[in-house]
């Protein structure tokens, strides 16, 4: 088939003031090719004709033509002319509709999936929606030093080496592991060397790997009641039988744990989730003795331990362990920002080779750039300063919440004065249902979570989880006011008598 030619002069849009001439010409020609005004097989005007028509240097036009060739829009050689390709790059990037339709039809047939896939339940965490009172588990993201973080990021990019671009060991970037080991040793009394630290996308990934390594179908795993649902989901997905033990003011009630047959126990001793209590030293020693006697391993999730407002810090459970039976996990998502997706696990030496193997088969390693930036953020002292600053701010916000709640909610909801963390708990007057109260609060743009979302039983049936860290004092006051209106409406609806002052 003979090549098509055109005798028509092109009609191109005006060149924007700040756009280079070659870029303007490339964009204009590409647009006309995609729109069909320059159809497949047609010959473009010569570089001389375009130069004469638009008053451009031929070198500028040649540059634009070369870019069109490089991206697959035209073909040709000097002297033979330049022609629009019959198959454009956009066509290569999209599947035709008929093929899409066949794929959808095939997907409608039942698929054979593994036992894991049938057992696993979607864990979405906490919804990614705008912050409002009293959404729990959120730090004050507006106070994170974004400018400083960006500056360190750009510096790391300028200095990044070829070796760093290739990645790092499965367990993470060694300088970051060294910084984490030093930090948890100093602040939490954790006993470890850097080689025991694994950098992960978060504690949730650590739970998944621990479940894969330690839990067989039918094994018994113990958790606190109430408990972080992501942990329960990780263990159940691998076929674990979950045993729940209650929590009192000193922590998990060890007497409720089975005497034998438990493979693993998951606890949050530094700041029980979601109740907020701190496990006493005596209870920690009792739990360690039980674990040794029953040959169980312990997964210690030390989330939120950085933000302690009263009382002396209690050393991590791992620091009291002299038998190598505790896996210690921490995260930067609440200390810095959730999207960072970096956490860590301190692994007992005997488990380290198997953990490294499992990690290498999972995500290879955590994102390298984020590890580099976080390493510098810690080394330069910004991490410690940020924690100290935010601890003061969060303590003030907790005080505002307690004072406002005492004045406005005292007869309907008693809020606990927690020693640490980003949220607290509130206990409803008898007769008001927590689920109904949460639904009523939501109609007034207030988020409170019923504790029943974290476990069964009457002991937590009247409890609500209430976040405060992400809210300015004025937002806390407004939230308490709206919550009071919602709870008063529930009191009237359920005809609960007013408490006398």
Task: Outline where the language-model segments fall.
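Short glycine-rich anion-binding loops that position phosphate/pyrophosphate groups of nucleotides
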Residues: 139, 269-273, 334
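Helix-loop "lid/cap" segments that line or gate small-molecule binding pockets
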Residues: 344, 372-380
């Amino acid at each position: 088939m003979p090549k098509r030619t055109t005798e028509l002069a092109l009609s191109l849009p005006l060149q924007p003031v700040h756009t280079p001439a070659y870029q303007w010409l490339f964009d204009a020609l590409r647009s006309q090719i995609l729109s069909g005004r320059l159809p497949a097989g047609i010959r473009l005007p010569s570089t001389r004709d375009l130069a004469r028509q638009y008053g451009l240097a031929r070198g500028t036009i040649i540059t634009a033509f070369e870019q069109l060739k490089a991206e697959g829009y035209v073909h040709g050689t000097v002297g033979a002319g330049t022609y629009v390709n019959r198959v454009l790059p956009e066509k290569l990037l999209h599947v035709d509709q008929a093929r899409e339709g066949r794929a959808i039809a095939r997907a409608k047939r039942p698929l054979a999936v593994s036992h894991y896939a049938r057992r696993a339940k979607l864990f979405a965490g906490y919804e990614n929606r705008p912050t409002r009172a009293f959404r729990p588990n959120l730090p004050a993201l507006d106070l994170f030093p974004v400018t400083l973080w960006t500056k360190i990021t750009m510096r790391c990019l300028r200095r990044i080496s070829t070796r760093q671009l290739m990645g790092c060991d499965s367990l993470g970037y060694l300088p970051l592991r060294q910084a984490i080991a030093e930090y948890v040793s100093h602040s939490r009394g954790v006993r470890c060397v850097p080689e025991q630290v694994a950098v992960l996308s978060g504690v949730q990934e650590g739970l998944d790997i621990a479940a894969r390594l330690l839990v067989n179908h039918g094994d018994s795993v113990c958790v606190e009641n109430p408990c972080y649902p992501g942990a329960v989901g990780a263990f159940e997905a691998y076929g674990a039988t979950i045993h729940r033990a209650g929590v009192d003011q000193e922590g998990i009630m060890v007497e409720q744990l089975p005497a034998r047959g438990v493979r693993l126990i998951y606890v949050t001793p530094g700041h029980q989730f979601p109740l907020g209590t701190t496990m006493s030293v005596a209870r920690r020693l009792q739990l360690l003795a039980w674990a040794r006697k029953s040959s169980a391993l312990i997964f210690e999730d030390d989330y939120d331990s950085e933000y302690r407002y009263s009382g002396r810090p209690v050393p991590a459970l791992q620091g009291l362990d002299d038998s190598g039976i505790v896996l210690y996990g921490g995260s930067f998502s609440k200390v810095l920002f959730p999207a960072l997706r970096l956490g860590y696990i301190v692994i007992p030496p005997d488990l380290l080779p198997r953990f490294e193997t499992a990690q290498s088969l999972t995500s290879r390693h955590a994102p390298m750039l984020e590890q580099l930036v976080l390493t510098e953020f810690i080394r330069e002292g910004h991490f410690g300063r940020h924690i100290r600053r935010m601890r003061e701010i969060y303590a003030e916000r907790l005080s505002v919440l307690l004072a406002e709640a005492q004045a406005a909610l005292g007869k309907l909801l008693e809020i606990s004065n927690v020693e640490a963390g980003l949220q607290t708990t509130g206990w409803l007057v008898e007769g008001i249902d927590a689920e109904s109260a949460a639904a009523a609060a939501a109609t007034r743009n207030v988020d409170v979570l019923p504790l029943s979302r974290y476990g069964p039983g009457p002991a937590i049936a009247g409890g609500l989880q209430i976040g405060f860290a992400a809210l300015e004092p004025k937002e806390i006051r407004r939230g308490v006011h709206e919550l009071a209106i919602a709870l008063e409406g529930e009191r009237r609806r359920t005809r609960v008598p007013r408490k006398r002052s």
